[in-house]
């Protein structure tokens, strides 16, 4: 932490103020994404024609396997892992419903019930699609004492699929908890004795299971794994690579537009104390939805994300308590007339928020969805009030109880805020009823907020305390329960496991809201696992984050 004396003429009777500057690293990207060169139109059109032809071929293959459930499940799994399932949503939905009805409802089993890989794949794909198939299907793989059979010890492929399936568990499924421990322990012991590509798959899954991975990043990883298997479907792989490159061109264009907008605001100069993370913010939102139909949604959410990131830093890395009260009141009034009452340095931020919201409001009016703006403004007011409460705690050096901390920290995690904003550009499915459901704070939302807050606290605790930030959840828990930091981390891990089960329960049919809306919640949660698993990669952009961004926005696939 560095206390700097900064003159503020707009605050009466104070010529200079001491501010706890965080010294965030600057952006590493410069103008890297400012200048986007469009691909040749003829080449683009040719790729699009190839994609359409290959899509038809895959549809025919899915239809041809209707009476071969395992073969069909393998095709569905490959399309999902390769990031092209969005092209076949109806076909996949019909196929899984058919498999569910004919292998579970009628037979209460899967035809390959003595093959661990087949049963685990069947279980995982149906659970992912919301079907509450019973984990009793794994009974065949346990002995009379309830332990998993020793004969499974060398079935690496089956163990890997079992491991992936266990991450779809919900509360009360102790068998899957046991299966996770069994599969994980055994995979860890044999991974160094496996051959490529299976060994690489196991290492990757042990670090990040599919359920917690971002679909777009998982696709990049899976391309080379899938290609290494001689049995891979050449049409699927070619389609996936072509589609990846077409989408990458779209995403780079979007980011170029965003980067020019961001530079026009000149926030890096006006708010040098704040994190300049436009590119990382776009990557975050790209994790929420990458599909082409959500281009407007990405633009809206990225712009608002950039605003709230700056506001967050004003509250916890620069503003004085008196200044923050003025800003909080201005947000509550939501009126351009409030500009005159703000310190000079705050004015560009406040005006930009109003401008961004006015731009969104115009778009919502054109869509006949103006009602959404009420919710968008309410979450902004709520999160800013939360930031204000945290600033008071910090100013007073107050360490709340863990329960008191979490009640506020869930709000300032920003995940109800981001989920609300992510719905704005999603078209007709984002109904008034969907927003009311979201504002009722259902368990899946609280779980997403909890994962966000707990992972953030675990990864950034030391840095935040060094710079005099508000007490973190780790600190509050240690003080209240008289435990060491390691014990607090263990408790947080247990809470993360519980929260993921809540997420999974929220995805069981019947859905509370349309599945695409639930998917935004899941993907926002997945982003946290990617960015905050071991460190705060948003604040401190290191190799892992650079590589992830490059893989999605710089490096094309070789077809």
UniProtKB/Swiss-Prot annotation:
GO molecular function (one): terpene synthase activity
Positions that bind Mg(2+) 1: 312, 316
Coiled coil (UniProt feature): none
Pfam family, one: Terpene_synth
Protein name, as recorded: Sesquiterpene synthase
Organism: Santalum austrocaledonicum
GO biological process: diterpenoid biosynthetic process
Motif position, DDXXD motif: 312-316
UniProt superkingdom: Eukaryota
Classification lineage: Eukaryota, Viridiplantae, Streptophyta, Embryophyta, Tracheophyta
